[in-house]
Amino acid sequence: MADTTVDKLAKEVGKSADRLVEQFSQAGIKKSANDTVSESEKQQLLDFLKKQHGGDAAPQKMTLQRKSVSTLSVAGSGGQSKDVKVEVRKKRTFVKRDEAAEAELAAAAKAEEEAKAAAAKAEAEAKAKADAEAKQKADAEAKAKAEKAAKAKSEKQEAAPAQTADEKAAKDEADKLQAAKDEVAKAKADAEAAAATEEARRLAEENAKRWADEEKARKEAEKTGDHHVTTSTEARAAEDTADANAEKRGRRPRKPSANAGNNANSNSNAGSGRPGGKGKRGKDNRRDNRNSRNSRNARSVAPESMDQAFNKSAVVVKAEVSIGETVSVSELASKMSVKATEIIKQMMKMGSMVTINQVLDQETAQLVAEEMGHKVILTRENELEHQVLADRNGDVKVEPRAPVVTIMGHVDHGKTSLLDYIRRAKVASGEAGGITQHIGAYHVETGNGMITFLDTPGHAAFTAMRARGAKATDIVILVVAADDGVMPQTIEAIQHAKAGGVPLIVAVNKIDKPEADPERVKSELSQHGVMSEDWGGENMFVHVSAKSGEGIDELLEGILLESEVLELKAVREGMAAGVVVESKLDKGRGPVATVLVQEGTLKQGDIVLCGLEYGKVRAMKDENGKAITEAGPSIPVEILGLSGVPSAGDEATVVRDERKAREVALYRQGKFRDVKLARQQKSKLENMFANMVEGEVQELNLVLKADVQGSLEAIADSLNKLSTDEVKVNIIARGVGGLTETDATLAAASNAIMVGFNVRADAQARKVVDSESVDLRYYSIIYQLIDEVRDAMGGMLAPEFRQEIIGLAEVRDVFKSPKIGAIAGCMVTEGTIKRSAPIRVLRENVVIYEGELESLRRFKDDVSDVRNGMECGIGVKNYNDVRVGDQIEVFETVEIARTL
């Protein structure tokens, strides 16, 4: 390497040439600014400078730094916590002294230690010398004191009188007596201790088996018992009781030890016999004796159980909690006898945050109560109604009762005449005469028993009873004129009887007329499903004449025979129950109801709950207007005292408490409006699908009326052919002529549609249609009627659902959005992309995600749809794994209506 000049070296190191020349001279090298400098000279200068500035020596000082970072979680406002970083810095400096200073410090420390040792030695010598002098002085004083005491004692002995021989003999005698007493007491104590030990051993042997059984039962209970800890008051009380019993068993009665007592007596006697016997020493002796007595008794009595642990009741005391439809947290806590906070904690464990006033549904409250170990009893809104109706007579004797018969038929076929003849012939003389009935029901006595007849003109009460689920009639008598045959109202009566499931007896009336043709009646009735016994059927046919009385007795015998087959029985004693046959509002008496008693005995003064009304029976009258005080089963009676007019068909029940009866009646009145509104929606064609029950065959009930018999048969056959496996057409009533009130009532009771072909409904029928919201339709073309019925049946079919693809977009690029996430830049290749429609994400023609759109934009604007051939940005909700090349498919679900 070429040599450099001093001037050039000065420029390289950043110093002036004069300063560098001066440093060279100090190092013993003489140079000028223009002289060259060799490498050896540079090294010589560097060594000089290091030596001058201490660079060649070892470092005398060292500094160490350390930094640690930790994170603390600090609670902030609003119950949220935040993290705070804490940084700790430490710095330590170590200084190394030179050897001279180290030697000087070591010498100083050594000199200081030698000085301390010399001082300690001198102090020890001085202390030993002082101790020796003090000991000598104390010995001299003690010797002088002893000499003085000996001198005083000798002087005292010389001065005191000598002890006499009698006193010495008395003292010896007392010592001998005391020794004898001690020996006797010790022997007695040993004997009692041995007896106590033997008693304890005997008790242990006797109770060993019982203790073993108790221990085994306790362990079994712990294994099989419910260890779920509850916070109920009953559980805590059970634990406290178990603890108290365990403590009582542990505290066995102690027998006082004779040894201990004698020892105490001897010690007390000894203490009293000498001075200071009642001092501190005497108290200590008594305390020692008590401790020894306790220890001996503890050893002599065997414990009942060696288990020293806490005895918690293994079986949880379960309380019965009654929960209604809804209950608040505070009410539930009160029923469970716990604090509301315990329920809130339990629900927090179950994942629900509630407050003390929050209302829980029945299912949630049941889960909470069962989780806390209680037995739950679910109650309904009408629980009071069930309780009132269930609080009746218990096990009572069931006896046969009279049949209840309803007479039906065409108005011109002699139904009224037949009723009048039976009444005139069978009612005993002397009663309120006349054939005018005060009420719509009466009973007659025959030689074979009693029969109760219901007069139901227009069949209104019968239909209303069946619609309300009340079966008041046991047998139906169908009156048919022998000279007139089957008429439309006769067919209606047959349909009513079949719908109610009531046995039917046919009374062929006017048999005394010359033009009577009973065989024609049998033939016509057989076409409607009523077959005579002579023809192999099940229906009894009786030929009667309401004018001459022919066949009346046979008819009554047939009724009683049918009742025997039915085996009609009822409770005769106890609280009554029945059904309202008819009711009215009398100007002078108020609400009046005719009740047919079905079981029990109705008495004057009973509390009656009758549908929406209630009241106390103030007066009772029979069918003849005669006041009575009680009525048994199958007896019609007129009662007064109800709060309002009940409806025909309402159930009348005797209850115990008038206040509860009023509560039930008010509850029923509040519920009546909802039930009525719900009933109005049943038979609408538009709501047929809502009435469908999955898995069951649907039925479309129809009441069909036509102008001529030919059209009626053609329509009925066509409608029956429409029935399928899923929907069935059920024509519950058909006939020729206009739509009557009976047809409307039957349609309302059966949830049917009234269909009229070239006929119309009368005023009374339209009134029922309006009040019951029955669907009424008129037709003049058969095909139009069939098409609309087919459409109605199609509406009852379960619909089909189909998914149609309405758009397809291809992902060209993916962008990231801080709010939404991955945004797919797409080109619409098919159809239209709609924001509200569900989507599928396809990758290599395989569906990998199905969801919905969160964002659809074109440029920066939110749009509702994007058409084919346009670009857009698509954000998929809850999905960020969209890649380039994916396809986004937009589809919609279309409901396909099924047709027959």
Swiss-Prot record:
Annotated stretches, region: G1: 409-416
Gene Ontology terms for molecular function: GTP binding; GTPase activity; guanosine tetraphosphate binding; translation initiation factor activity
CDD domains in UniProt: IF2_eIF5B (cd01887), IF2_mtIF2_II (cd03702), mtIF2_IVc (cd03692)
Region spans: Disordered: 119-306
Cross-referenced InterPro entries: DNA-bd_dom_put_sf, EF-G-like_DII, EFTu-like_2, IF2_assoc_dom_bac, IF2_II, IF2_N, P-loop_NTPase, Small_GTP-bd
Region (G3): 455-458
Ranges of compositional bias, category Basic and acidic residues: 119-158, 165-191, 198-229
Binding site for GTP: 409-416, 455-459, 509-512
Entry's family note: Belongs to the TRAFAC class translation factor GTPase superfamily. Classic translation factor GTPase family. IF-2 subfamily.
Record function comment: One of the essential components for the initiation of protein synthesis. Protects formylmethionyl-tRNA from spontaneous hydrolysis and promotes its binding to the 30S ribosomal subunits. Also involved in the hydrolysis of GTP during the formation of the 70S ribosomal complex.
Protein name from the UniProt record: Translation initiation factor IF-2
Source organism of the structure: Shewanella piezotolerans (strain WP3 / JCM 13877)
Gene behind this protein: infB
